Design a protein with these regions (language model features):
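Extracytoplasmic/periplasmic solute-binding protein
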Residues: 42-50, 55, 83-180, 223
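Ligand-binding clamshell of periplasmic/extracellular solute-binding protein-like
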Residues: 1-36, 49-59, 124-134, 150-162, ...
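Short, solvent-exposed loop/beta-turn-alpha elements that line the ligand-binding surface or hinge
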Residues: 17-31, 116-125, 169-192, 241-243, ...
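Glycine-centered hinge/linker elements that transmit conformational signals in sensory
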Residues: 134-140, 176-211, 254
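Sec-exported extracytoplasmic/periplasmic mature domains
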Residues: 11-15, 62-69, 138-145, 196-203, ...
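Alpha-helical segments flanking ligand/cofactor-binding loops in enzyme cores
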Residues: 215-216
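A local structural motif
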Residues: 113-124, 177-180, 196-210, 222, ...
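Hinge/lid segment of periplasmic solute-binding proteins
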Residues: 4-56, 65-67, 74, 78, ...
Length: 265
């Protein structure tokens, strides 16, 4: 087994050769084009795709539900404040003067309204763009123990490639065409500006984080979001089994850079 970035050396050293593909499985009916491109060198297929690494948005589902409830409560509270004022001569009935059963019914109705609206917020909560992510960070009243809404490894391009990968061209699809390089284009520059703003917003110092540390912080409930790779599922499930992870979590595609610029994950 070799990683795709070692295939060129293996081929040039005579340790790998063109795959005969006698059964005809090396096509997009069986593999995504990205996988086929990863095992292609000099327009020759020199390996079979076995597995791949990618980055994904990992989120604390319980915190996201808490955020959804907070937004529902704020919206309903705002609606109450905007109700028409009491007119002259109209009687104001204090809640304390209501019979206990009516008070209970009102509380139950209020809770039902909050829960219903919170479900709507939660159903649409996963960020589609970086702006959506920043909006959650801006409006989340973090409970005790939460140190930040999002933290990820800012040192490794692998966990940051999603934000520029759709527009930064290095070697074409297979990655070995020295004549196909374009990193100084308007789209890539815009993506990097968004990345810079994102990093500054969450104020992540590169010398204070590693991939292991940000995943551990997520397990400890210190963050709502992080960026994980293929191995994160195993690590989270192991933490859940030994009791160190005490919440529900989910995994989603990385959000787009903006409404106009797509991400790659």
């Amino acid at each position: 087994l070799l990683s795709s970035d070692s295939l060129e050396k293996a081929y040039l050293a005579g340790l790998a050769s063109k795959v005969p593909d006698t059964v005809g499985i090396c096509n997009t009916d069986h593999f995504p084009q990205a996988a086929l491109s990863a095992v292609t060198y000099d327009q020759k297929l020199i390996g079979y795709p076995v597995y791949f690494d990618t980055s994904a948005l990992v989120y604390n589902e319980d915190y996201l539900r808490t955020w959804a409830t907070q937004q529902a409560e704020k919206e309903l509270a705002g609606s109450s404040e905007n109700d028409e004022p009491i007119g002259e001569g109209e009687e104001i009935i204090e809640e304390d003067s209501l019979p206990e059963d009516q008070t209970t019914e009102q509380v139950t109705a209020d809770e039902a309204a909050v829960n219903a609206l919170a479900e709507q917020y939660f159903a649409e909560a996963l960020p589609s763009t970086v702006d959506d992510l920043l909006n959650i960070a801006d409006t989340f009243d973090a409970p005790e123990g939460v140190e930040g809404v999002m933290k990820w490894d800012v040192n490794n391009i692998f966990y940051n490639y999603w934000i520029v990968g759709n527009y930064m061209i290095v070697g074409g699809d297979p990655g070995d065409d020295r004549n196909d390089i374009d990193i100084n284009n308007p789209e890539t520059i815009q993506c990097l500006e968004v990345y810079k703003a994102l990093n500054q917003f969450f104020f992540i110092e590169s010398d204070t984080v590693t991939y292991d540390s940000v995943i551990q912080d997520f397990i400890d409930g210190k963050t709502m979001f992080t960026i994980g790779t293929t191995d994160v599922v195993k690590r989270l499930e192991e933490a859940k089994a030994d009791g160190s992870l005490a919440f529900n979590y989910g995994i989603a595609r990385m959000p787009d850079v903006s409404a106009e610029l797509q991400s790659r994950s």
